A protein has these predicted regions:
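Terminal amphipathic alpha-helical/low-complexity segments used for targeting or macromolecular assembly
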Residues: 1-56, 61
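Periodic glycine anchor positions in long extracellular repeat architectures
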Residues: 60-63, 78
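Flexible, glycine/small-residue-enriched loop-and-beta-strand segment within the central core
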Residues: 42, 71-77, 82-151
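LRR N-terminal entry segment and analogous cap-like coil->beta motifs
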Residues: 64-68
Length: 151
């Protein structure tokens, strides 16, 4: 199980969620804590760099958010991130600096490290994607196996 430890999987300096990730050994231990972490961190973000755009939604002033994107909090969208047309952020989402959440991509209870790309027709649920990860079109990650049993 050594290879599954957070310290062996991720470059922690590439996420605003570093403190949360350092509090656990395995990635799945972090998932139930994302919501509270966002709310706590969001209230501490530099107001010169981030705007609060709704209840528990903080968006970096340099981020680009399409007018057709839907963002439900809690959520933090990092500097220079791009939230494209019809992206659906269901809540409990940390989107890293320079990340791309694309057309018709849905996020729920996730941490996307800096420069992650989920550019089109993706579903990312209950997941952590590391620095510079890229998901191809139509890819799905979630906590349900194809046989519908919990992972």
């Amino acid at each position: 199980m050594e290879e599954c430890k957070i310290c062996n999987l991720y470059s922690l300096d590439q996420s605003i969620a570093r403190k949360l990730l350092e509090s656990a050994v395995y990635p799945w231990e972090v998932l139930p804590k994302i919501k509270e972490f966002i709310i706590e961190l969001g209230n501490q973000l530099n107001k010169d760099e981030y705007e609060q755009k709704g209840e528990n939604v903080w968006i970096a002033k340099t981020a680009k958010v399409a007018p057709t994107a839907y963002i439900n909090g809690p959520a933090i969208i990092g500097k220079d991130a791009e939230i494209r047309h019809c992206a659906f952020i269901r809540g409990n989402a940390i989107i890293g600096e320079g990340a791309v959440v694309g057309n018709s991509t849905e996020l729920k209870n996730v941490i996307l490290f800096n420069k992650v790309q989920v550019p089109h027709y993706n579903y990312v649920g209950d997941s952590i994607l590391g620095y510079k990860s890229h998901m191809g079109a139509g890819s799905i990650t979630s906590n349900v196996k194809s046989d519908k049993k919990l992972v």
